[in-house]
């Protein structure tokens, strides 16, 4: 262990493998007249935390003593004893308390901690990440209070941090998660040719007070029309124009096809000159009653409009029915497109602009964007998704946590939780790797073995 008062924690790493032997004497007192197996099980279950924390403390003290000896041997007479500094860490196997030895270095005019010269110790925290990691997953799936209970259930002594501490520490973990993969060095086509975009509202708070609501927005894409979806961009409070700028930096080429629910601003920001914009047909059918309601027509007065809308054949297809359409049968596709356009024109004549301003604008938008899939099929022979259902499926796994369990968020907290939920839902392997990295499983492993075991009955 090459000790050197460098001023940096871990400045004296273990240069080669060394073995520390701990001679442990364990005394087991067995009372008479007790169910022995059950009593032993309970005793060792209670003892496990004490045993491991005692051994862990002994190892730290041994490393500290050796490092101090090496420092004093390398720099004779340089250091003066300055007492100790108490430290405490809550680890997965229980609490560890240690008095860190302090040495005064008059040459460098600073305090030297031998143990910090040998290893990097957790700074300014009592609850170590290794203890909190099992609770982070429950924070994503359920809530921070459930996360706190999970940590308490795993701790040998039943201790747990407050849910406020879990929330605060979770932010650092979530900041390491990015649901947008790095495509910089990936060969082949990027998953931005076929994009889907959607947004929703999220309530925010600032310093405990209502801060209104912000737009929660998500853009996903795939390499083929029906290929696996990957996150291209996610945001809280950003406009579609800001999202478009980030997408153009990652993917300079505009998408071939863009599918949205018709939210204002999506096609203007995300679509390029050659992009085909397809309106989600599920939202198209669902949003007509709201447009009529905006024009002041209650349910009893809008049946004739809804019936005429239902006679547009191109808006009634589902994805399975479209898959059964023969792409080589151009006359049949052209007939379906023309019939749909004629039905749209008939509906348009029933909607004078003076009486139906919102509904007329809504229907005119659907004539172009709602039937885009038929024009694309006629021109290329290729089917595209008719709805944002696959994107809505991703939303369903995220919004339960963000809008039902958690009701109010700060903007950074909402963004961190959105990232964690997306990574957990779409890339579980990457989430598991992030947990493993937090536990240090990527580092060279220390081997702990019981090399000999001998039992002796006391006389």
Q: Model regions: which residues?
A:
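RNase H-like nuclease fold core
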Residues: 2-33, 80-84, 88-89, 95-132, ...
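Short, surface-exposed amphipathic charged segments that create phosphate/polyanion-binding patches used
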Residues: 209-214, 291-303
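Inter-helix linker motif
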Residues: 273-297
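An N-terminal, globular interaction/scaffold subdomain
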Residues: 41-91, 98
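Short basic-aromatic helix/loop recognition motifs at nucleic-acid
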Residues: 135-142, 384-386
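DNA-recognition alpha helix
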Residues: 146-157
């Amino acid at each position: 262990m090459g000790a050197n008062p460098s001023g940096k924690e871990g400045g004296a790493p273990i240069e080669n493998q060394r073995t520390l032997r701990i001679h442990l004497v364990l005394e087991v007192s067995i009372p008479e007249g007790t169910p022995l197996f059950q009593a032993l099980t309970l005793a060792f279950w209670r003892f496990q935390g004490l045993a491991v924390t005692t051994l862990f403390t002994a190892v730290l003290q041994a490393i500290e003593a050796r490092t101090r000896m090496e420092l004093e041997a390398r720099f004779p007479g340089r250091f003066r004893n300055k007492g100790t500094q108490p430290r405490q860490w809550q680890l997965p196997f229980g609490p560890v308390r240690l008095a860190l030895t302090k040495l005064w270095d008059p040459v460098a005019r600073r305090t030297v901690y031998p143990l910090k010269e040998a290893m990097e110790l957790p700074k300014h925290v009592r609850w170590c990440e290794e203890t909190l990691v099992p609770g982070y997953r429950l924070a994503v799936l359920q809530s921070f209070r459930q996360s706190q209970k999970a940590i308490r259930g795993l701790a040998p002594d039943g201790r747990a941090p407050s849910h406020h501490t879990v929330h605060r520490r979770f932010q650092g973990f979530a900041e390491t998660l990015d649901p947008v993969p790095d495509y910089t060095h990936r060969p082949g086509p990027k998953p931005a040719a076929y994009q889907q975009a959607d947004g929703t509202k999220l309530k925010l708070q600032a310093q405990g007070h209502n801060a209104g609501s912000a737009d929660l927005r998500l853009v996903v894409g795939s390499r083929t029309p029906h290929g696996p979806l990957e996150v291209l961009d996610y945001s809280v409070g950003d406009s579609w124009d800001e999202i478009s700028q980030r997408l153009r930096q990652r993917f300079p080429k505009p998408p071939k096809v863009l599918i949205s629910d018709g939210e204002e601003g999506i096609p203007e920001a995300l679509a390029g000159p050659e992009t085909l914009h397809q309106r989600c047909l599920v939202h198209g059918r669902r949003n007509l009653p709201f447009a009529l309601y905006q024009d002041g027509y209650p349910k009893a007065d809008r049946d004739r409009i809804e019936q005429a809308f239902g006679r547009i054949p191109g808006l009634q297809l589902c994805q399975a029915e479209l898959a059964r359409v023969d792409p080589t049968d151009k006359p049949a596709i052209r007939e379906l497109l023309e019939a749909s356009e004629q039905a749209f024109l008939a509906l348009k004549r029933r909607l004078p602009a003076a009486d139906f301003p919102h509904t007329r604008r809504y229907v005119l938008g659907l004539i172009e964007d709602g039937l885009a899939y038929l024009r694309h099929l006629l021109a290329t022979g290729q089917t595209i998704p008719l709805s944002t259902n696959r994107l809505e499926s991703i939303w369903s796994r995220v919004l339960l946590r963000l809008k039902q369990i958690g009701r109010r968020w700060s903007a950074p907290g909402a963004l961190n939780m959105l990232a964690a939920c997306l990574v957990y839902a779409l890339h579980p392997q990457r989430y598991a790797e992030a947990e493993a990295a937090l536990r240090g499983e990527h580092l060279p492993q220390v081997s702990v073995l019981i090399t000999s075991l001998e039992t002796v009955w006391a006389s």
